[in-house]
A protein has these predicted regions:
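Short acidic/polar active-site loop segments enriched in Thr and Asp
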Residues: 98, 190, 226, 325, ...
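Short, electropositive alpha-helical surface patch
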Residues: 207-220, 240-254, 307-324, 349-354, ...
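Radical SAM/AdoMet-radical enzyme domain recognition
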Residues: 186, 213-214, 218-222, 227-228, ...
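Conserved strand-turn element in the central/C-terminal portion of the radical SAM core barrel
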Residues: 9, 156, 160-167, 227-236, ...
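Proteins enriched for Cys/Gly/acidic motifs involved in redox and nucleic-acid/cofactor modification
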Residues: 1-202, 241, 252, 256, ...
């Protein structure tokens, strides 16, 4: 069978889609190659969320098209979010594309590759969800993987095109999620990252607003699942029961990904999100009281059409007061088909970049102070391997650092075993990364600490 090369862009949810498509292709007998120049078929799984992501996707398609002209490639398939938004335009403007595949068609990847008609569209099941029976080929290195618990979104945030791309909320059953978690553990995975457009909305489509709380407790019973974390939560969906479940479930890491997008009430109202600075501070207080030792990450958008100097100042003051462990900042880009598109783009790009820089510099100071406060503490660290720049240093992450976005722990001295959890004493805290050394006793000490935490629901750092 033909060799297939994959380029996967965008968020972890898109990565899961790519892994499912790879699983289907492998099941059909295709050979998967990491050497793109050898691939006879190239698949580009695109992201179309914001302007910069679209530009990156177009660049990847053009790169693949160049390989098609010069290399072994004879067929170029474009998949993902950009196809859902711009299928006809892509096919019209880029004759190099041989076929397109939308986000709700991923189980038909082999069928699309085998079709002769570039306009071929498989019969669509709008309720399609991958599950524990779907073939999936993991591409994440090491002992960490993503697990998508739902697809689609029922929110109507003014800036966001995701509901039109991914469709309405569709939750997997808890039995299916638990089964896949057990499959991942059997493949050597220690850390599972739960993802969805809004994980805290999980289960509401089948009538259970407490479904995520129950799922957390359910995953707490999975033997060998050392860590799992919740990404993409929504502020008004954080129930007391969910927070208690996080605090009381030993292998649920004390980490919360809570994208708030802004803090000024007027801007949030224009975003169709609601809330505001005082509401969010009360929420953060409750989170930190209920889940002691929790690490909180948030994301914010600067330069939204209704953002004035005063409303940005409100956001800046909130970030300073809230003292998050991690913050991401994005500049607003108007997206066709969203309610905010009609508001135009009145904030100059230069102003957006300045505001982003101000927030990031502020957060750097906060993160540095928080990381320095960890000096001398022993943290459980997932050792991911040797550092790319030197074999003398190993890299890893502690519970408060999600994959790819939150920095890491640089482990100096010794030879810690890769893809294991090790107790590491922090010797130095920087703005993004920590430096530490493995505590004598290594793996045995880590196992004892893990068992104690499972019994008590402890926070995982001393």
């Amino acid at each position: 069978m033909a060799k297939v090369g994959f380029m996967s862009l965008g968020c972890p949810k898109n990565l899961v889609d790519s892994e499912v498509m790879l699983g289907h292709l492998k099941l059909k007998g295709y050979t998967i190659t990491h050497r793109m120049e050898e691939a006879e078929i190239l698949v580009v799984n695109t992201c179309g969320f914001i302007e910069s992501a679209k530009a990156e996707s177009i660049e990847a398609i053009l790169e693949a098209a160049s390989m098609k002209q010069k290399g072994a490639c004879r067929k170029l398939v474009v998949a993902g979010c950009m196809v859902e938004r711009y299928r006809e335009q892509l096919l019209a403007d880029m004759p190099e594309i041989d076929a397109c595949l939308g986000t709700r068609d991923i189980e038909h990847i082999a069928e699309v590759i085998g079709a002769d008609d570039r306009l071929f569209e498989p019969e669509r099941d709008p309720a399609y969800l991958y599950d524990e029976h779907s073939p999936r080929l993991l591409t994440s290195p090491g002992a960490s993987a993503y697990l998508k618990i739902s697809e689609g979104c029922d929110h109507a945030c003014a800036f966001c095109a995701i509901p039109s791309i991914r469709g309405p909320q569709r939750s997997r059953t808890p039995e299916s999620i638990e089964a896949e978690a057990r499959q991942l553990v059997a493949q050597g995975i220690l850390e599972v990252n739960l993802v969805g457009q809004d994980t805290t909305d999980y289960g509401r489509d089948f009538g259970d607003p407490d479904a995520l709380e129950k799922l957390v407790r359910r995953l707490g019973t999975v033997e060998g699942l050392r860590w799992f974390r919740i990404h993409y939560s929504y502020p008004n969906r954080l129930t007391d029961g969910l927070l208690r479940a996080m605090a009381e479930t030993g292998n649920c890491v004390k980490y919360l990904d809570l994208p708030l997008q802004h803090a000024d009430a007027r801007v949030l109202k224009t975003m169709a999100r609601g809330g505001g600075r005082s509401t969010f501070m009360k929420l953060l207080g409750k989170v930190r009281r209920t889940v002691p030792g929790v690490f909180v990450r948030s994301n914010f958008i600067v330069g939204f059409p209704s953002e004035t100097e005063a409303s940005f100042a409100d956001l800046r003051d909130f970030v300073e007061e809230a003292r998050f462990e991690h913050v991401g900042v994005f500049t607003y880009s108007p997206e066709e088909g969203t309610p905010a598109f009609g508001l135009g783009d009145p904030v100059p790009e230069r102003t957006k970049q300045k505001r982003k820089r101000i927030l990031m510099e502020l957060q750097q100071k906060i993160s540095r102070a928080k990381n320095r406060a960890l000096e001398g503490q022993v943290l459980e660290v997932l050792v991911e391997g040797r550092h790319e720049e030197t074999e003398l240093i190993f890299k890893g992450r502690h519970q408060g650092q999600a994959p790819e976005v939150d920095g890491g722990v640089l482990i100096v001295g010794g030879e810690p075993e890769e893809n294991t959890l090790q107790p590491v004493r922090i010797t130095k805290g920087h703005a993004y990364d920590l430096v530490g050394e493995v505590v004598e006793g290594g793996t045995e000490a880590a196992v004892r600490a893990f068992e104690a935490r499972r019994r008590t629901g402890g926070a995982g750092h001393a």
